């Protein structure tokens, strides 16, 4: 249902002709007059196998996007690639979520590795927070789909993203790019390439991106999500001789942004905090009609507030502060005509400020909060050695190497829960492991207390050490048949230390008793030892006095940190240590067949490659905190990929069609879900699904009907399903029963089953220069954003209850380039039809009963200018 009328933007869209594509041009700076004369597809070079090769000659499902294409499409951040790259999903937020073929990691916790490896000039970036790179001085981006466990190592069960920078060279050059747009968008990029002598070259680039956000928090009057990123990139290249070069880079990044606000809705009335446990919240005065939790969520609903507005209270803690520093050096030695050696060393540090991790209640009230309350520090040091060679007149091509990395992470997070109410009859029934009677009969005694510990402060210290050795070789059996074998062995040591401190229940009890309004607590430990007992309300009007509000007022947020001021008990401090080494081999084998020349028709079919690949990917296990149970071991996940594909150039190389069909088997897939610990506290934790599988197909089409017209299309269809996945029923576990739920019928979260893109780009040339118009169209099918079985049931009933129904986005761009080719001006619009679509965050229908929804960008438009020097 479209609740809001949206203004037309025909004046902006009218001058933009249909267009969409990944540009076929691989060079970073194509001259304007030369580009127009090319009526055939150019060769695209990629480094997916650690050596420069034609994309059409390698048995890997890869999409390559050049710097020209990024500018033509107006892509300023790699997150925008999700619109056109098959099976790729990227979500921005506190944790940058990158998914390929349904495989991804959605939390951003320091203890959990991502499943898509991101590489910057051969340097592995281990954390997801810094992986969404602004496209500053980028030469190309390659997206490798499917496990890349042999050459790229751990954390590539989904695939890899390889980002290559423009490198310093001998030609002095500079550029400036500036942009403005609605919502106070301001962008500035600038770079200069400056040689110092004949053998030493330097390059520097800056990026500043800011805007004021489009989503208003009515409680504060501030907008979110805002962009406020600044970065500086310095590079050098020393060509010491004809055979040896040394590249260095230094990167400094500063982020001061607000994350996206949310709206709240209730997907299930049977949730624990709504009707499941029949507990009261501040504002509830009738035990037979508990409405406060629902009303709190409704106060932050889109239906009540209107379009692009939220109500998350006066201190939602959405500020994201992240400082990043990176140093790297790459030495390349051409030992002989057939042998080269490369070494890559990197040092990386990050500091992230306090930030809200989750708001389970979803509304303005301060009832449940997960907050990182201290700075988080991350350090990593890595070294890689690559030996590339060939033999037998290039029939054998091989790569071998070693990889080592040490990473340290510190993470502080605090879980805070408001005091809640319960009637005496319900408490007695829960103590007997019985479901509560509803509605509650009149005349019951109100009690106040906690479901789970009121406050838990956790400090996580982690140290990860990775060692790996790898080799891969391709051999031409004959002119048409290539066999590739690869093998990698990875050893991953995980050391985790978790320190927790809980609230002082004796001090909380004294404050309640000291008020004179509450009696001595019961000894019924229904919700675990950390929760304490329940205290009867002694006021004259019973429930009509709103006893939960009276109790909650005794523990205000006096310091404004979005946490209740419960006293901590140092005697509850405990320390858990986990230390284990995980080892895994990730082999691969591939057979590629190239059609012989006598099968090819120069006009109809120009080249054709068919391949079959078997490969394996690995993601390390780790230790997960599970409430009072301390650290629990999470098994590694392993993916086995069976894939066949083809790559075809046809019709005098004016058409390129690449496709792949795959069947991927998952063992011990790592998933986050809502569960309980042994003391019956509700916890959000990782676990392993026994087995799951992915079956899918991908297709990319690029067609140049003429030198001025370019048509692109992409399609991905995936079927995700769990084969073995059971977990304890949450409500039964909370009341002390053991009942298992089969979740094998559920789909994977975040990734749609189907995605597609289609469009056309047209270019005119004349005395005034070159005018290029394009329109990008992208489509996503239904997306599930839930954590638990009840969320999936709500999603199946209606996708908008716990996900996002299918939607399409339309982007347009009109660019003029002067005859000299050194000045261009672009008018652009994104989401031209002003579509409203959800991009998360999460639905939890079994416990809190809320669906917290962040919304994608509304219609955006602006102007860009680029000047070359």
Segments (PLM) and residue ranges:
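Membrane-embedded beta-barrel scaffold of Gram-negative outer-membrane proteins
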Residues: 330-334, 340-346, 351-356, 594, ...
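Acidic, small-polar-rich N-terminal luminal/periplasmic segments of exported/outer-membrane proteins
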Residues: 36-171, 644
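C-terminal beta-signal and adjacent terminal beta-strands/loops
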Residues: 422, 606, 706, 778-793, ...
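Outer-membrane beta-barrel translocator/receptor signature
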Residues: 114-115, 127, 136-145, 150-232, ...
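Periplasmic-side early beta-strands and strand-to-turn transitions of outer-membrane beta-barrels
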Residues: 162, 170-171, 177-179, 191-287, ...
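Structural signature of Gram-negative outer-membrane beta-barrels, strongest in the C-terminal barrel
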Residues: 239, 387, 397, 401-405, ...
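Gram-negative outer-membrane beta-barrel transporters
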Residues: 398, 479-483, 491, 660-665, ...
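C-terminal beta-signal and terminal closure region of outer-membrane beta-barrel proteins
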Residues: 2-4, 154, 689-695, 749, ...
């Amino acid at each position: 249902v479209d609740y809001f009328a949206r203004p037309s933007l025909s004046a902006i869209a009218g001058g933009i002709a249909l267009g969409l594509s990944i540009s076929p041009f691989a060079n970073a700076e194509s001259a304007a007059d030369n580009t127009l004369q090319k009526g055939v597809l150019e060769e695209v070079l990629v480094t997916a196998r650690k050596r420069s090769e034609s994309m059409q000659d390698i048995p890997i499902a890869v999409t390559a996007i050049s710097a020209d294409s990024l500018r033509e499409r107006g892509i300023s951040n790699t997150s925008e690639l999700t619109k056109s790259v098959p099976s790729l999903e990227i979500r921005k937020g506190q944790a940058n979520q990158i998914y390929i073929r349904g495989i991804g990691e959605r939390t951003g916790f320091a203890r959990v590795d991502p499943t898509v490896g991101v590489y910057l000039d051969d340097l592995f970036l281990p954390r997801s927070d810094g992986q969404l790179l602004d496209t500053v001085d980028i030469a190309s981006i390659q997206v490798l789909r499917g496990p890349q466990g042999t050459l790229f190592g751990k954390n590539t069960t989904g695939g890899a993203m390889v980002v290559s920078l423009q490198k310093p060279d001998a030609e002095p050059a500079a550029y400036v790019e500036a942009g403005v747009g609605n919502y106070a968008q301001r962008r500035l990029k600038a770079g200069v390439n400056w040689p110092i002598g004949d053998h030493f070259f330097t390059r520097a680039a800056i990026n500043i991106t800011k805007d004021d956000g489009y989503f208003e928090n009515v409680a504060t009057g501030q907008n979110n999500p805002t962009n406020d990123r600044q970065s500086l990139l310095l590079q050098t290249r020393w060509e010491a001789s004809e055979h040896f070069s040394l590249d260095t880079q230094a990167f400094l990044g500063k982020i001061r942004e607000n994350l996206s606000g949310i709206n709240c809705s209730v997907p299930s009335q049977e949730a624990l905090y709504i009707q499941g446990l029949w507990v009261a919240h501040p504002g509830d005065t009738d035990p037979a009609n508990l409405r406060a939790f629902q009303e709190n969520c409704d106060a932050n609903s889109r239906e009540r507030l209107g379009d692009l507005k939220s109500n998350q209270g006066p201190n939602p803690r959405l500020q994201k502060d992240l400082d990043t520093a990176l140093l790297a050096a790459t030495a390349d030695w051409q030992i002989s005509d057939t042998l080269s050696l490369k070494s890559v060393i990197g040092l990386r540090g990050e500091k992230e400020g306090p930030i809200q991790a989750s708001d389970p209640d979803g509304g303005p009230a301060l009832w449940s909060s997960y907050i990182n309350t201290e700075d988080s520090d991350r350090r990593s040091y890595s070294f890689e050695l690559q030996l590339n060679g060939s033999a037998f007149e290039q029939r054998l091509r091989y790569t071998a190497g070693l990889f080592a990395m040490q990473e340290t992470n510190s993470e502080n997070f605090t879980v805070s829960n408001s005091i809640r109410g319960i009637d005496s009859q319900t408490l007695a029934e829960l103590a007997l492991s019985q479901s509560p009677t509803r509605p509650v009969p009149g005349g019951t005694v109100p009690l106040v207390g906690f479901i789970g510990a009121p406050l838990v402060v956790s400090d996580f210290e982690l140290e990860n050490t990775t060692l790996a050795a790898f080799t891969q070789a391709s051999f031409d059996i004959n002119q048409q048949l290539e066999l590739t074998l690869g093998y990698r062995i990875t050893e991953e040591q995980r050391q985790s230390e978790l320190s927790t401190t809980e609230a002082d229940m004796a001090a909380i009890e004294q404050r309640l008793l000291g008020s004179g309004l509450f009696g001595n607590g019961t000894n019924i430990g229904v919700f675990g030892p950390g929760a304490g007992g329940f205290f009867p309300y002694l006021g004259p009007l019973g429930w009509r006095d709103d006893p939960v509000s009276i109790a909650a007022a005794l523990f205000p947020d006096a310091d404004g940190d979005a946490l209740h001021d419960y006293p901590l008990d140092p005697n509850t401090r405990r320390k858990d240590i986990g230390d284990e080494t995980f080892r895994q081999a990730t082999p691969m084998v591939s057979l590629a067949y190239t059609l012989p020349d006598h099968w090819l028709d120069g006009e109809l079919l120009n080249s054709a490659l068919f391949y079959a690949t078997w490969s394996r990917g690995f993601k390390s296990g780790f230790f997960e905190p599970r409430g009072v149970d301390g650290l629990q071991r999470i098994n590694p996940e392993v993916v086995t990929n069976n894939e066949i594909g083809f790559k075809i150039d046809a019709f005098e190389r004016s058409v390129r069609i690449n496709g792949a069909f795959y069947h991927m088997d998952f063992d011990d897939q790592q998933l986050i879900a809502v569960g309980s610990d042994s003391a019956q506290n509700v916890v959000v934790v990782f676990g392993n699904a026994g087995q799951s599988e992915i079956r899918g197909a991908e297709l990319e089409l690029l067609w140049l009907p003429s030198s001025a017209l370019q048509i692109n299309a992409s399609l991905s269809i995936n079927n995700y399903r769990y084969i073995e996945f059971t977990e304890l029923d949450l409500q039964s576990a909370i009341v002390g029963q053991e009942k298992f739920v089969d979740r094998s019928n559920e789909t994977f979260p975040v990734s749609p089953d189907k995605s597609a893109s289609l469009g056309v780009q047209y270019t005119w040339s004349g005395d005034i220069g070159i005018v290029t118009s394009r329109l990008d169209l992208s489509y996503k099918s239904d997306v599930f954003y839930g954590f638990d079985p009840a969320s999936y049931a709500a999603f199946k009933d209606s996708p908008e209850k716990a996900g996002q129904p299918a939607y399409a986005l339309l982007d347009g761009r009109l660019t003029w380039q002067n005859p000299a080719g050194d000045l261009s001006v672009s008018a652009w619009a994104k989401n031209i039809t002003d579509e409203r679509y959800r991009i998360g965050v999460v639905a939890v229908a079994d416990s809190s009963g809320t669906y917290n929804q962040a919304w994608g960008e509304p219609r955006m438009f602006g102007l860009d200018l680029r000047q070359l020097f």
